[in-house]
Amino acid sequence: MEASASKLIVACAGNVVAVTRRDPELMDVLVACGCRVVINDHADQGMGTSIAAGVAVTPATGWVIALGDMPSIRVDTVLTIVEALRAGARIVVPTMDGKHGHPVGFSALYRARLQSLAGDTGAREILKTDTMFADEICVDDAGIFLDIDTPADLKVQH
């Protein structure tokens, strides 16, 4: 989580909200990285509630929805997503070899829909219904696919 948060802090000029369950040790790490921490007491109900909680506390003009278990995403990939949002993109999806990855950027047009998310599908439904508004950006970054779910996953990535 620390590696993911640190990269996002750099790419997003320090404007990072980390949404997590109530875990004092994790919260301390995130605050030390420079994140604003929001507690999601409904985290057990799925990723959608975490996205909704993070969007609700920010007056942002767009969001890069990133997962804490994807520390291999490069800073320049996140910067490219941020720049596309600033240039007027509605949704920005990084791709490599024709496959979609993470993180995904959403403009302020999606505030209400992001705030109403629930369940464990995250923003996937928005991507399905609004695919015609998604800008795909090609990146040379396999990190957009790599998540760490177990200690073995971490060993494979190193």
Can you annotate each of these PLM segments?
Residues H102-F106, L146-I148:
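Short glycine- and hydrophobic/aromatic-rich loop-to-beta-strand nucleating segment
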Residues V29, A84, R113, L117, ...:
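Residues that form generic nucleotide/phosphate-binding pockets
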Residues S116-H158:
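Conserved alpha/beta core of the MobA/IspD/sugar-nucleotide pyrophosphorylase nucleotidyltransferase superfamily
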Residues M1-H100, A108, M132-V139:
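Nucleotide and nucleotide-moiety/phosphate-recognizing core
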Residues T77, Y110, G119-A123:
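Internal, well-ordered alpha-helical segments in soluble enzyme and binding-protein domains
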Residues V75, R113, D153:
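Conserved protein kinase catalytic core
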Residues G68-D69, Y110-A118:
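Short, glycine/charged-rich beta-strand-loop motifs at protein surfaces that mediate ligand recognition
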